[in-house]
Amino acid sequence: MKYIDEAIIHVIAGKGGDGVAAFRREKYIPKGGPSGGDGGRGGSIYAMADRNINTLVDYRFARIHRAKNGENGQGSDRYGKSAHDIVLRMPVGTVITNEATGERVADLVQHDQKILLAKGGTGGLGNLHFKSSTNRTPRQFTLGEPGEEADLKLELKVLADVGLLGMPNAGKSTLIRAISAARPKVADYPFTTMHPALGVVRVDQNRSFVMADIPGLIEGAAEGAGLGHRFLKHLARTRLLLHVVDIAPLDEAIDPVYEAKAILEELRKYDEALYRKPRWLVLNKVDLLPENEREKICKKFIRSLRWKDKNFAISAMTGDGCKELTYAIMEFLERESMDENQERATFAEPDTSD
């Protein structure tokens, strides 16, 4: 299935049914009172998060979603039938924005989360509501109200704890295959990964985290070059970024330090908030370096890059260093969660001082 992470849809809620002016016409009651019923409610349109859906492809090709109108009221006090609501199922992680105003309508972050997109119109009133002591035969009734209508932008941002970024062929897909059950395509040519891949990394029976792999970045990505710029938004929700670098490129003309700096610059130009996220350096393919020179080459690279944060030397192909990396990630995420919980508890603690 083609991966689609953006779509624009037009939603039209149903109009409320009209009320009606009618009178009782029964044998032996020549002047019956008003009996016009109300119109039914128009159908509303909802969005619901569904963890079994992972693309917005259905909404790229079916753009208009219209709920039915409520039925009109009838005589003999019969109310019009309300229309059924429509529920649009979308992937967890979908952000919904009003195209006209730019206002965020919803952020679907939990399975079965349900949000109203367009409210159906209220049904009109029949003439039985207008009877009074001075007006026994009212002919007034009201029309049903129109339903809400809007153009909405749908944007999927995957929910992951950890995001991988790096140049094409840095070994990101091999890494996520090595430590999770995800099976992205792996090959010896650039841009093998064409869309985000998610993998659940299980550290032990009770602990796990979700990792996201996106297409590799190239220089100029922030201005639209390559594929990765389209998918950088999928790293927005992550709590930790892993900058994966091919420390042993087969092409001697490639400078890993230059490429690593280029990635950091693209990240900074794309989104300052994303650039400021916690970020670790992962030097991949150390198995291709001479064993007696690995440590020296890695240290030289870190000095040249002026890297101050955490770094790991691994081989995603052989698994060397991967276990240590996954445990370090899990510990970091657990500390982050504890700190967040403490902050919330401190914020919520009532002030008992006089």
Swiss-Prot record:
GTP-binding keyword on record: yes
Keywords: Cytoplasm, GTP-binding, Hydrolase, Magnesium, Metal-binding, Nucleotide-binding
BP-aspect Gene Ontology terms: ribosome biogenesis
Subcellular location: Cytoplasm
Binding site for GTP: 166-173, 191-195, 213-216, 284-287, 315-317
Xref: Gene3D superfamilies: GTP1/OBG domain, P-loop containing nucleotide triphosphate hydrolases
EC number: 3.6.5.-
Cofactor(s) needed for function: Mg(2+)
Subunit relationships: Monomer.
An annotated Gene Ontology molecular function: magnesium ion binding
Stated name of the protein: GTPase Obg
EC top class named in words: hydrolase
GO CC terms in record: cytoplasm
Record-linked CDD domains: Obg
Family: Belongs to the TRAFAC class OBG-HflX-like GTPase superfamily. OBG GTPase family.
PANTHER family: DEVELOPMENTALLY REGULATED GTP-BINDING PROTEIN-RELATED, MITOCHONDRIAL RIBOSOME-ASSOCIATED GTPASE 2
Role, per record: An essential GTPase which binds GTP, GDP and possibly (p)ppGpp with moderate affinity, with high nucleotide exchange rates and a fairly low GTP hydrolysis rate. Plays a role in control of the cell cycle, stress response, ribosome biogenesis and in those bacteria that undergo differentiation, in morphogenesis control.
Domain Obg: 1-159
Residues noted as binding Mg(2+) in the record, renumbered to the chain: 173, 193
UniProt cross-references to InterPro entries, sorted A to Z: G_OBG, GTP-bd, GTP-bd_Obg/CgtA, GTP1-OBG_CS, GTP1_OBG_dom, GTP1_OBG_dom_sf, OBG_GTPase, P-loop_NTPase
Gene: obg
Domain OBG-type G: 160-334
